[in-house]
């Protein structure tokens, strides 16, 4: 049984890499945001707007805990904040979990986030010139939680295919 959990900040490529890895290793790919949306029949943006972040984080924890304690094999992409709440970071160190932090520099992440920040509840009200400071602060605050991953892969200047190859080497 393989439980591969991809961790990283917004726009680190978790979803794209998860989908590519899924095809390569023949495991189902799951995205925690999609699982939450499916369980509530609402988008993440709608959940944030209607119920607030605290409600969202509680639901996120419940979904993550249920999935990680299941007997299934999968590749799971977490939200950027998932490890930082409700002691979710402790699940990253379970014996049957392979947790991988996709680590990007502030510059890389800001470049990627500028393209679709309207789809990100935490960013949609920020001006582009505020993004770098916001991302840098978040990365600093979240480093403790992200560092609980068993593996770290630097994503700067690498294609998704190169990153998938690095992960494949870890797995096999």
Swiss-Prot record:
One GO cellular component, as annotated: cytosol
Residues bound to ATP: 11-16, 120
Keywords: Amino-acid biosynthesis, Aromatic amino acid biosynthesis, ATP-binding, Cytoplasm, Kinase, Magnesium, Metal-binding, Nucleotide-binding, Transferase
GO MF, one annotated term: ATP binding
EC number(s) reported in the record: 2.7.1.71
InterPro entries: P-loop_NTPase (IPR027417), Shikimate/glucono_kinase (IPR031322), Shikimate_kinase/TSH1 (IPR000623)
Cofactors: Mg(2+)
Gene3D superfamilies: P-loop containing nucleotide triphosphate hydrolases
Catalysed reactions, as listed in the record: shikimate + ATP = 3-phosphoshikimate + ADP + H(+)
Compartment(s): Cytoplasm
One GO term of the biological process aspect: amino acid biosynthetic process
Cofactor note: Binds 1 Mg(2+) ion per subunit.
Broad class of where this protein is predominantly found: cytoplasm
Positions of Mg(2+) binding: 15
Pathway listed: Metabolic intermediate biosynthesis; chorismate biosynthesis; chorismate from D-erythrose 4-phosphate and phosphoenolpyruvate: step 5/7
Keyword Magnesium: yes
Enzyme class: transferase
Function text: Catalyzes the specific phosphorylation of the 3-hydroxyl group of shikimic acid using ATP as a cosubstrate.
Assembly description: Monomer.
Protein name per its UniProtKB record: Shikimate kinase
Organism, scientific name: Flavobacterium psychrophilum (strain ATCC 49511 / DSM 21280 / CIP 103535 / JIP02/86)
Gene name for this UniProt entry: aroK
